[in-house]
Design a protein with these regions (language model features):
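N-terminal, active-site-proximal structural segment of metallo-dependent hydrolase catalytic domains
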Residues: 2-10, 18-83, 290-294
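Preference for well-ordered, secondary-structure-rich cores of eukaryotic proteins
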Residues: 46-56, 80-85, 96, 126, ...
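Lectin-type carbohydrate-recognition ectodomains
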Residues: 294-439
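Structured beta-strand-rich core segments of catalytic domains in phosphoester-bond hydrolases
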Residues: 68-157, 264
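Acidic/histidine-rich helix-loop elements
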Residues: 31-53, 119-131, 157-167
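Active-site beta-strand/loop signature of hydrolases that rely on acidic residues for catalysis
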Residues: 27-34, 57-79, 106, 139-141, ...
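Metal-dependent phosphoester-hydrolase catalytic domains
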Residues: 180-188, 196-296
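Active-site-proximal segments of metal-dependent phosphoesterases and phosphodiesterases across multiple
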Residues: 156-175, 195-209
Length: 439
C-alpha cells in the first residue's frame, strides 16, 4: 500500500546547506495510553472526571515539553488534551469511538509525511479490539536540516486468548514489514502500547530487533540487554524501572544520524491528579536520545511531494569507502522523469521512469558534484519535482526538466560532495534529497 500524506512540506528547511547547520542534539519522547474511551465503555479504575483528567494530561504535556509524544486511546476526550497542551505540531484526530484509531502525536518538530494504517487483523476474543480501526501511524519527522527520523505510534490487539495472540503478533509483524518497505535506510523510533511482554513467550515483541535491527530502550538501559524470563509487573504509579510494562520504545540510527538512548523512566509520578490519584491505567514511559551527524555520510533536506515508492541509496553507500560521482544522468521534459549517478567504482544508482530526454555530464577525476537545484509543481493534484540542475566544483552544470517558480538549492557542506539519492518515485521523481560524502 502506498501511503499518501495528510500533511505536506514541499521543500524542507533552508535553501542551501551551510556551516551553521546543527550537527548534534537531544530528543525526548513520551508514550502514554490516555484512557480516552467513553466512560461507559471503560472501567479501568481511574478515578475522577475524564474531561478534567484529559485537561490535566494536556497541561502536563505542556509543562514537561517532551519533544515527541505518542498517545493511544485518544478518543472522545481528545479536544480537552489539546486545549491545555502547547506543542506547535500535533496530528488531527481521526475521530472518537468507533471512527478513530485513538493514535495521535504531539511534537516540537514538524513532519513531511504522515499516514494512518489500520491493522490487517484484529480480534474480539477477550475484548472489543475490532470496535475501532486500531493500527499504527507513520511520520517522517524533521529534527534539523538534513536530520530526519521515522516515527511510528502503535496500539496492538489486547488480551491473551488464542485469537488475541494471533492478532497481536500479526500487528507487530505488520509494523516491522512496513518499516522494511517505507523506512529503508532511515533512523526509526517505534513507541506506544504494544500490549506485549517479553516474559509472555507467545508475544513476538522481539521482531523489531530481529527484523529491523532496533533496540528496546528499557531492555538496553534497565535490563542490560538481557531479555527477562521472570514476570515482574509494575504498580501504578511505578516506583521502579526494573519492572516490565506493555508500553515500549524501540530505536535505531542510520548511516547519517547516530542515535543513542541515554535515559529511560516510568513517568507515572509526574502524571497524577491533584489528590495523588492516577490519570490513566498505564505507566507513561519516557526516553532521551542523543543524536549526532555521521562523519562519513550526510543528507540534504527533501524537495517534492509525498507520492510514489520510497528509495534510498544510503545502505549501499554506507559500505563504500570514499565514494565519488563520475557520471550524472538526468531525464526530463515537462517534469523530472529520472535521476542517476554513476560512481567512480562503477556503481550506478537510478531512480524514476524512462520518459523524457537524457542529459549527461561526465566529471573529471578531481571534479565533484557540489550542488543541486530542484524545482517542483503540481501534476494531477500531486506535488512532484519538475526540474534539476547539478553544479560541479568547477562550475559546470547539467539540467533536465522544466523550471518552476518554486525551487530550492541543496549545497553540500564545504569539503563534501553529492554521491547519491533518497526519496520517492514512480514514473517520475516525486520527492528527492541528496546524499553527501567527504571529497
Amino acid at each position: 500500500m502506498k501511503p499518501t500524506s495528510l500533511k505536506m512540506l514541499l521543500a524542507g528547511g533552508a535553501l542551501s546547506s551551510g556551516a551553521l547547520a546543527q550537527t548534534s542534539g537531544d530528543l525526548t519522547i513520551l508514550a502514554m495510553n490516555v484512557a480516552g474511551l467513553p466512560e461507559i465503555l471503560q472501567n479501568n479504575e481511574v478515578p475522577g472526571d475524564k474531561t478534567t483528567n484529559s485537561r490535566t494530561i494536556g497541561s502536563y504535556f505542556a509543562k514537561y515539553n517532551y519533544d515527541i509524544i505518542n498517545v493511544q486511546e485518544d478518543f472522545n476526550y481528545h479536544a480537552y488534551i489539546y486545549e491545555t497542551d502547547t506543542h506547535p505540531y500535533r496530528t488531527a484526530t481521526s475521530g472518537g469511538v468507533p471512527l478513530g484509531s485513538g493514535l495521535n502525536t504531539l511534537a516540537n518538530y514538524d513532519w513531511i509525511e504522515f499516514e494512518r494504517v489500520k491493522w490487517s487483523t484484529c480480534s474480539n476474543a477477550s475484548g472489543s479490539d475490532c470496535l475501532t480501526p486500531k493500527g499504527f501511524t507513520f511520520m517522517r519527522l524533521r529534527v534539523a536540516e538534513g536530520v530526519y527520523v521515522d516515527v511510528y505510534n502503535l496500539h496492538t490487539d489486547a488480551g491473551t486468548e488464542a485469537g488475541d495472540l494471533t492478532a497481536r503478533n500479526s500487528n507487530l509483524h505488520q509494523v516491522a514489514d512496513y518499516i522494511d518497505t517505507w523506512s529503508v535506510g532511515n533512523a526509526v523510533l517505534v513507541f506506544g502500547d504494544t500490549n506485549s511482554r517479553y516474559t509472555r513467550t507467545s508475544d513476538q515483541i522481539g521482531v523489531f530487533a530481529s527484523q529491523n535491527g532496533m533496540r528496546d530502550v528499557w531492555l538496553q538501559l534497565e535490563r542490560a540487554g538481557v531479555v527477562p524470563t521472570v514476570e515482574t509487573l509494575c504498580a501504578n504509579p511505578s516506583t521502579t524501572n526494573y519492572c516490565e510494562t506493555v508500553d515500549k520504545a524501540f530505536y535505531r540510527g542510520n548511516a547519517v544520524v547516530n542515535l543513542e538512548a541515554t535515559y529511560f523512566n516510568y513517568e507515572s509520578s509526574k502524571f497524577l491528579q491533584s489528590n495523588g490519584s492516577i490519570l490513566t491505567d498505564h505507566n507513561p514511559i519516557t526516553a532521551n536520545f542523543t543524536w549526532s551527524l555521521s562523519s562519513t555520510l550526510r543528507q540534504s533536506d527533501f524537495s517534492g511531494g509525498p507520492h510514489g515508492d520510497w528509495f534510498s541509496d544510503l545502505p549501499a553507500l554506507a559500505s563504500k569507502s570514499k565514494p565519488k560521482a563520475s557520471v550524472l544522468t538526468f531525464r526530463g521534459a515537462d517534469r523530472l522523469d529520472s535521476v542517476a549517478v554513476t560512481l567512480a567504482d562503477g556503481t550506478v544508482f537510478t531512480h524514476g521512469g524512462t520518459g523524457g530526454t537524457a542529459a549527461t555530464l561526465t566529471l573529471a577525476a578531481t571534479e565533484y558534484w557540489t550542488a543541486a537545484k530542484l524545482c517542483w509543481g503540481k501534476k494531477s493534484n500531486e506535488t512532484r519535482n519538475f526540474y534539476i540542475q547539478a553544479t560541479t566544483s568547477t562550475g559546470r552544470t547539467v539540467a533536465a526538466g522544466t523550471a518552476t517558480s518554486d525551487c530550492a538549492t541543496h549545497t553540500a557542506p564545504s569539503g563534501w560532495q553529492i554521491v547519491g539519492y533518497l526519496g520517492r518515485d514512480g514514473d517520475e521523481i516525486d520527492r528527492l534529497a541528496f546524499v553527501y560524502a567527504p571529497q
